[in-house]
Amino acid sequence: MKLDVIKLDGEAAGSVELDEALFGLEPRADILHRVVRWQRNKAQAGTHKVKTRSEVSYSTKKIYRQKGTGGARHGARSAPIFRKGGIYKGPTPRSHAHDLPKKFRKLGLKHALSAKAKAGELVVIDMATSEGKTATLAKQIKNLGWKRALVIDGAQVDAGFAKAAANIDTLDVLPSMGANVYDILKRDTLVLTKAGVEALEARLK
């Protein structure tokens, strides 16, 4: 698969040959769904917690005697049956992460790249460099028509470009090792540098 390469100012900069094994697959929603679910579950904090009857701030004294009152049998006010009592079998802190094989995660990334290529939402630029000025980069992005974009560079992201992009909320920047299915699908446009293409092909071959 051949794709035109452009510069940040919109000028042509030749073309690049993309590996069909990475960018030419028929995207499968089930694979993408499983990988995104794995990512989001792993990222979930899992700090949810409610108080049980032994943790609520109440006396543990029996509220009245067992027999002879005509009322139902009760123990302490902290019982779940009472208002402001403890919660029975409520959520406790835990990890929501689950396993997903490495081969499947790698396959998911290939399908995410292929999905962007098939939808016409893949752009290749020669390099992502900047003098560190947000206004300049924002103007270039506007002229290129990128509404919500993810830029994936090579092993290292240019410091000036990262600084300029930091204040643009519609632009994310990642090194090649940070490329993941969720971030690729979240943004409308996937922008790869030539170094990023080479690094991804080396990582996923």
Curated annotation (Swiss-Prot):
InterPro entries: Ribosomal_uL4, Ribosomal_uL4-like, Ribosomal_uL4_dom_sf. The keyword rRNA-binding applies. Signal peptide: none annotated. One of its GO terms (biological process) is translation. It comes from the Bacteria. Keywords: Ribonucleoprotein, Ribosomal protein, RNA-binding, rRNA-binding. GO terms for molecular function: rRNA binding; structural constituent of ribosome. GO terms for cellular component: ribonucleoprotein complex; ribosome. HAMAP family: Ribosomal_uL4_B (MF_01328_B). One of the primary rRNA binding proteins, this protein initially binds near the 5'-end of the 23S rRNA. It is important during the early stages of 50S assembly. It makes multiple contacts with different domains of the 23S rRNA in the assembled 50S subunit and ribosome. Forms part of the polypeptide exit tunnel. Part of the 50S ribosomal subunit. Belongs to the universal ribosomal protein uL4 family. This is Large ribosomal subunit protein uL4.
